[in-house]
């Protein structure tokens, strides 16, 4: 680009052509010493020593493979022989008439209260009307009561019989006369076998029928 501009200026007469010719020459002069310096910096090749040429490295041999030791068999022992697999034992034929022994297990007999006869009776010998509480508690618990009023006077015996009649009426039971002064009070849930049933009435005297 700069060279074309200078040529144009020389062509127009604005620049001197000698200066243009001297500039490439000066550039060549500056480049020449540089080339010499570069050549001077090259190291001199060393002289070859004839003894060095004679010496050659010995060839490196590959290491020989190590020998594998043979397996040593201990003295007095023989090589193991292949073991044949054992065959499963055949099941012995079973006698069709054989039966395994059975041990019977004893079971406790189940006790059931349903349908069982009543073996418990409560016998009361009242000495006063205050013993009516014991009669009422036994009858209310479902136990038949035999009431013997022979040790009471007529008035107290009548009061106690009236109390028993009201008791069995309120609890839907029954009262029956065994003797003139002995009465059986039966709850509604109990059936006494062998006793004659009679109607209970507070108006009846315990001494009727004597």
Swiss-Prot record:
Q: What's any one GO cellular component for it? A: cytoplasm
Name of this protein: Cell division protein SepF
Q: Name one GO biological process term.
A: division septum assembly
Composition bias, Basic and acidic residues? 22-70, 83-93
Q: What does this protein do?
A: Cell division protein that is part of the divisome complex and is recruited early to the Z-ring. Probably stimulates Z-ring formation, perhaps through the cross-linking of FtsZ protofilaments. Its function overlaps with FtsA.
Source organism (scientific name)? Micrococcus luteus (strain ATCC 4698 / DSM 20030 / JCM 1464 / CCM 169 / CCUG 5858 / IAM 1056 / NBRC 3333 / NCIMB 9278 / NCTC 2665 / VKM Ac-2230)
State the source organism's domain of life. Bacteria
What does the similarity note say?
Answer: Belongs to the SepF family.
- Keywords noted in UniProt: Cell cycle, Cell division, Cytoplasm, Septation
Keyword rRNA-binding attributed: no
Provide the primary localization: cytoplasm
Q: Does the keyword Cytoplasm apply?
A: yes
Q: How does it assemble?
A: Homodimer. Interacts with FtsZ.
| Ranges where the record places region Disordered | 13-101
> InterPro entries this protein is in?
Cell_div_SepF, Cell_div_SepF/SepF-rel, SepF-like_sf
Entry-linked Pfam families: SepF (PF04472)
Q: Where in the cell is it found?
A: Cytoplasm
